[in-house]
C-alpha cells in the first residue's frame, strides 16, 4: 500500500472494495426488502387479521428459504416445538420457564452435533430470533402483559414476521400486532428506512475494507516511527495490539451492518415506532456505534451493542435470575447470550470474560462514586443525582480513564475475530487452542487488568 500514490490508493479502494462490496450487499438483500415492502402495502388493504398473519408467515418462509434453502427446516421445527409446548402449558403460570427449558434442550442438542456444525451455525441468527420471541411471549403471558394465548396463525406470524426473521431485531408481541395493523405510509417512515439502509451499507463497506485497505494504509504510515522502535519486543507488542484493534473494529462494523439492516427491514415492514400526539415516530434503534467506539464504560458497550437484545436479556433473563444473587444473575445472562449466539469456545470465552469485566467495572465505579461522591458510575448520572462532584476536572479524567480502559478491553476481546481467518473456520467456530494462542500473544492483559481492578475494589472497601 505504501508504494501507491494517494490517488491510486483511493481508486483501487473504490474499484477493488467499496463498489463490489456495496453491490454484493444489495444483491443479497434486495429481495428481502421487496418482500417487507410488499407485506407493508398488503396490510394497508384492510384484510382480515388472519390473512395479515398468514401473509407474514408466507413472507417469512420465503425469506428463510431464499437465504437458507432447505436448512430452514431447523427453524421451522423449533417454532412448531415452541407452539406445542405453549399449547400444552396454556393453563400454567410458568409458560416462560417451560419454553426456556424446551429451547435450551433443543439448542444444546443442535450444538452437540445433532446437525452439521456449519449448517447449524448458519441458522443461528434466525433461531435466535425465534427463541427470543417465544421466550418473551411466554413470560409476557405469565405476567399478564399479553392477555390470552395467541392462535397458531398469530403465533407463527409473530415468530416469522418478515421484517425480523432473518436479521432481527427482537420485537415484542405487542409491537408485532401494531405492525400488522397497517399504519399509514409517511415521509418520516421512508426517511428512516433510507437512513438505516445507507448506514448499513456504509458499515458493510467499512467492515470489509478496513482490514485489507484502510487500516494498513493509515496506521503503518502514521505510526511508522512507533513501529520501527529499536526494541524488537516493543515493536512486536505494538504490532500485535494494532492487529487486535484492526480485527475488533472490523468485527464491530459487521455487527453495525446487521443492526442497521435489521432497523431497515423491520421499519420497512411497519414495526419500530412510538405513537406521538399527532404522528408516528419511527425511532427503532438497534445499535449505537459511537457508544461502542468511544465508550464511557464496558457496561455502556454491552448495552449499546444491540439494544433490543440487551433489553430482552435484562427483562427476561437477568430479572428472573436475580433471586440467585447479582453476580450469579450476570453469569446466567451471559450464558444465555452465549447459547443464543451458538456455542463455540471463543465466543463463550469472550462472553464469560465480558461478564467478569462488566461486573468488576460496575462494582468498582459504584464504590468510587460513593467514596468520592462523584459522577463516575458506569452509567451517566441523572441530572438530579446527589453527588457533590459532577463535572470537575478530576471526574472527567476518571471517566476518560475508564473509557480508555474499555477501548483496551474491546481490542483485546476483538482480537479473536481475526479478519484473515477463512469463512469455514469462522462458521465452525474457533477452538480452544486458537483462543489461548491469540490471548497469549497479548499476555492475557485484559484479564490481568480486570483482576487488578478487583483487588483495588476489595482494598478500598
Swiss-Prot record:
Localization: Endoplasmic reticulum membrane
Major localization class: endoplasmic reticulum
Keywords (A to Z) from UniProt: Acyltransferase, Disease variant, Endoplasmic reticulum, Lipoprotein, Membrane, Palmitate, Transferase, Transmembrane, Transmembrane helix, Wnt signaling pathway
Consequence the record notes for mutating residue 187 to A: Drastic loss of palmitoylation
Keyword Protein transport: no
Reaction(s) this enzyme catalyzes, per UniProt: [Wnt protein]-L-serine + (9Z)-hexadecenoyl-CoA = [Wnt protein]-O-(9Z)-hexadecenoyl-L-serine + CoA
A GO CC term assigned to this protein in UniProt: AMPA glutamate receptor complex
Residue intervals on the Extracellular side: 39-66, 117-152, 220-252, 359-396
Topology in membrane: Multi-pass membrane protein
Active site: residue positions: 341
Keyword Ribonucleoprotein: no
Expression tissues: Isoform 1 is expressed in fetal brain, brain, amygdala, caudate nucleus, cerebellum, hippocampus, pituitary, thalamus, heart, skeletal muscle and testis. Isoform 4 is expressed in amygdala, corpus callosum, hippocampus, spinal cord, kidney, liver, lung, spleen, uterus, testis. Isoform 2 and isoform 3 are expressed in substantia negra, spinal cord, heart and lung.
Positions in the Cytoplasmic compartment: 1-17, 88-95, 174-198, 274-337, 418-461
Positions of S-palmitoyl cysteine lipidation: 187
Enzyme class, spelled out: transferase
Transmembrane annotation, as ranges: 18-38, 67-87, 96-116, 153-173, 199-219, 253-273, 338-358, 397-417
EC number: 2.3.1.250
MF annotations from Gene Ontology: palmitoleoyltransferase activity; Wnt-protein binding
Family: Belongs to the membrane-bound acyltransferase family. Porcupine subfamily.
PANTHER family associated with the record: PORCUPINE, PROTEIN-SERINE O-PALMITOLEOYLTRANSFERASE PORCUPINE
Disorder this protein is connected to according to its UniProt record: Focal dermal hypoplasia: A rare congenital ectomesodermal disorder characterized by a combination of skin defects, skeletal abnormalities, and ocular anomalies. Affected individuals have patchy dermal hypoplasia, often in a distribution pattern following the Blaschko lines, and areas of subcutaneous fat herniation or deposition of fat into the dermis. In addition, sparse and brittle hair, hypoplastic nails and papillomas have been described. Skeletal abnormalities usually comprise syndactyly, ectrodactyly, and brachydactyly, and in some cases osteopathia striata has been seen.
Biological function: Protein-serine O-palmitoleoyltransferase that acts as a key regulator of the Wnt signaling pathway by mediating the attachment of palmitoleate, a 16-carbon monounsaturated fatty acid (C16:1(9Z)), to Wnt proteins. Serine palmitoleoylation of WNT proteins is required for efficient binding to frizzled receptors.
Name this protein carries in UniProt: Protein-serine O-palmitoleoyltransferase porcupine
Species whose genome carries this gene: Homo sapiens (Human)
Lineage of the organism: Eukaryota, Metazoa, Chordata, Craniata, Vertebrata
